[in-house]
């Protein structure tokens, strides 16, 4: 399998990107990685490590797309950027997947304009896996489509179901519709119409899920439009971040608290691991004709390694073919 990596995407590029690539090929000799970016910078980073040099190659890219640029215009104009060249490798059939920790909007625009959507899919959905109290869960869409039609949400649910079954090994994953109340009649026109379609879809739909219940992980796939999903995602991240800050402040407030924390260290370590985004790799853009994964902007080498493994799993489990086939059956 050949994977294209945006070598300059993210806060820690290219150091974390290169290290993650090296760690990934050491764990899986069957993959080949193409890193796009300034060849001098990428080469300098690669020289720090010992690895099978035939497993990683560089495609020179002098430019970078930043988060401050208009996504569509940047993709169209910056054809010498690391992100454009990584996407183009998939478009031209020279790579099977693309991973970037750079601009989410530009990656989304590039995936849509350059790679395209699976036939029958109306919108590509950003679909991160989040840590839950009982088990991880997916939010789809988490920001790619601010405005949605009811049928889009049914497609998001189907794609999430296929990902959970194929990549995570969960049989008959549960699907919930994010809403302001659990009752069927709650919500706006979008959620009311989507509820009816999901109920009739044949998917394992369990009804509405209120945001306060989202983090339990009792429902595997939370379906919503991108505005709601992105708000939910950022609120969740913010609460987790501030919770850890509050906990740290309390632990360091007294000697007694420090002693207690020392005794609880293994428990606290496991708790922190649950909320470590690097454990989950990246967020797949479900519905794209190619495997497209958005890594977190502050991804470290572990996150990149896991995102690469995630791409491999998507390819080996043929999720694109499954989405195409099951969409036809649903319709």
Curated annotation (Swiss-Prot):
Location within or outside the cell: Cytoplasm
Record bears the keyword S-adenosyl-L-methionine: no
Recorded GO CC terms: cytoplasm
One GO biological process term: fatty acid biosynthetic process
Keywords: Cytoplasm, Lipid biosynthesis, Lipid metabolism, Phospholipid biosynthesis, Phospholipid metabolism, Transferase
Pathway: Lipid metabolism; phospholipid metabolism
Classification via Pfam families: FA_synthesis
EC assignment: 2.3.1.274
Reaction(s) this enzyme catalyzes, per UniProt: a fatty acyl-[ACP] + phosphate = an acyl phosphate + holo-[ACP]
GO molecular function: phosphate:acyl-[acyl carrier protein] acyltransferase activity
Top enzyme class: transferase
Chief place of localization: cytoplasm
Record family assignment: Belongs to the PlsX family.
Role this protein plays: Catalyzes the reversible formation of acyl-phosphate (acyl-PO(4)) from acyl-[acyl-carrier-protein] (acyl-ACP). This enzyme utilizes acyl-ACP as fatty acyl donor, but not acyl-CoA.
Assembly mode: Homodimer. Probably interacts with PlsY.
Protein name per UniProt: Phosphate acyltransferase
């Amino acid at each position: 399998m050949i994977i294209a990596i945006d070598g300059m995407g993210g806060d820690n590029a290219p150091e974390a990107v290169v290290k993650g690539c090296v760690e990934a090929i050491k764990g899986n000799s069957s993959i080949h990685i193409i890193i796009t970016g300034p060849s001098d910078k990428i080469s300098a980073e690669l020289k720090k490590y010992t690895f099978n040099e035939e497993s990683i190659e560089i495609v020179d890219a002098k430019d970078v797309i930043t988060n401050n640029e208009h996504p569509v215009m940047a993709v169209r104009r910056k054809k010498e950027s690391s992100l454009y060249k990584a996407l183009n490798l998939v478009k031209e059939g020279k790579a099977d997947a693309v991973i970037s920790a750079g601009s989410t909007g530009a990656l989304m625009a590039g995936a849509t304009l350059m790679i395209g959507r699976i036939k029958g899919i109306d919108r590509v959905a950003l679909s991160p896996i989040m840590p839950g109290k009982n088990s991880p869960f997916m939010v789809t869409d988490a920001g790619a489509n601010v405005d949605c039609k009811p049928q889009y949400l049914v497609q998001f649910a189907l794609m999430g179901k296929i990902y959970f079954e194929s990549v995570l090994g969960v049989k008959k994953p549960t699907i919930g519709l994010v809403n302001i109340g659990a009752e069927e009649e709650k919500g706006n026109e979008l959620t009311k119409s989507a509820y009816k379609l999901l109920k009739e879809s044949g998917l394992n739909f369990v009804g509405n899920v209120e945001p306060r219940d989202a983090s339990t992980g009792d429902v595997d796939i939370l379906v919503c439009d991108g505005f709601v999903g992105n708000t939910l995602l950022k609120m969740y991240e913010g609460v987790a971040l501030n919770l850890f800050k509050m906990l740290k402040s309390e632990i360091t407030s007294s000697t007694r608290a420090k002693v207690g924390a020392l005794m609880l260290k293994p428990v606290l370590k496991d708790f922190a691991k649950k909320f470590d985004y690097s454990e989950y790799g990246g967020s797949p853009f479900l519905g794209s004709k190619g495997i497209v994964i958005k890594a977190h902007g502050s991804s470290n080498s572990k996150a990149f390694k896991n995102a690469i493994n995630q791409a491999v799993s998507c390819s080996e489990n043929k999720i694109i073919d499954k989405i195409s086939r099951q969409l036809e059956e649903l319709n």
